[in-house]
Amino acid sequence: MTCTLVFQSRFCIFPLTFKSSASPRKFLTNVTGCCSATVTRLPLSNKVLTAVDRSLRCP
């Protein structure tokens, strides 16, 4: 199962996808390369991320 998160910034709106079984520190990158983020926490009984690392970057 994969899940998708959508982040919005001043410059771009982009989806991040991840496997529900992914490592808590799994590195994620969107399909266009616009931005990237690192997962900091995955919930045990939910299908969405509860937290994303502050390292989110956009051009």
Curated annotation (Swiss-Prot):
Keyword presence, Membrane: no
Compartment list: Host cytoplasm
Keywords for this protein: Host cytoplasm, Host-virus interaction, Modulation of host cell apoptosis by virus
CC per GO annotation: host cell cytoplasm
GO biological process: symbiont-mediated activation of host apoptosis
Ranges in a coiled coil: none
InterPro entries named in the record: Circovirus2_Orf4
Subunit structure: Interacts with host FTH1. May interact with host ANT3.
Biological function: Antagonizes host cell apoptosis by interacting with host ferritin heavy chain. The ORF4 protein physically binds host FHC, resulting in the reduction of FHC protein levels in host cells. Reduction of FHC concentration further inhibits the accumulation of reactive oxygen in host cells, leading to reduced apoptosis.
Protein's name according to its UniProt entry: Anti-apoptotic ORF4 protein
